[in-house]
Amino acid sequence: MKIKRSKCMAAAKCALASALLLSVLAFAAGCGGTDGSKDDGNVINVPASDAVTSITEAIGDSGIDSTVKKGQADFDDNFKDLYGISEDLITDGAFAYDSTGASADEITVLRVGKNDDIDKVKQALETRMSQRQQDFGGYKPEEAAKASDGKVFACSNYVFLGICDDSSAARSAFMKFMQSAAQ
């Protein structure tokens, strides 16, 4: 009798482990691998500005006080200079930042038009993060360090850049937003 019970327990543990693994894989399929790589083609379609708002609300008071989105003059006029890529690569986008320029804080979410361009957009945001580090390196080392600790992550057809006091929390907020948008 003990043998049967232990076999049942082992089977139950195996089933539970399998269910947990499947749920992790299902989430990863919507947001690429845990390294931020692009996904298998799942497409989410929500306004990038909604993602930015959700993230900035989740991270709280970070010095970010302005948000612009694709279609607004501040976004359209500055996109190529800030990110070094053509606006034609994205179908939507928004970024939030500290308008005083006193901090490196920035949250950017871009919806990429073609899956083939995700890596190019991701690289552009990584370059932007490095540029922010250089911008503050000479006179505000704490802001340069913040930029150095920033996160760039691809989820579905979106690419995220988070530079703030807790970039891991910003990344988590982005992933949570995208997970809810995928459902």
Kindly label every feature range from the protein language model.
Residues 3-18:
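Bacterial N-terminal signal peptides that target proteins for export
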Residues 26-30:
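C-terminal motif of bacterial Sec signal peptides marking the signal peptidase cleavage site
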Residues 32-35:
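Bacterial signal peptide processing site
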Residues 68-104, 116-121, 147:
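Short, compositionally biased low-complexity segments enriched in polar/charged residues
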Residues 106-114, 158-164:
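Second-shell loop/turn segments in exported
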Residues 121-128, 173-179:
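Short amphipathic alpha-helices in soluble, non-transmembrane regions
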Residues 127-150:
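An anionic, turn-rich surface loop/hairpin at beta-sheet edges
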Residues 142-183:
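A short, solvent-exposed beta-edge/loop patch
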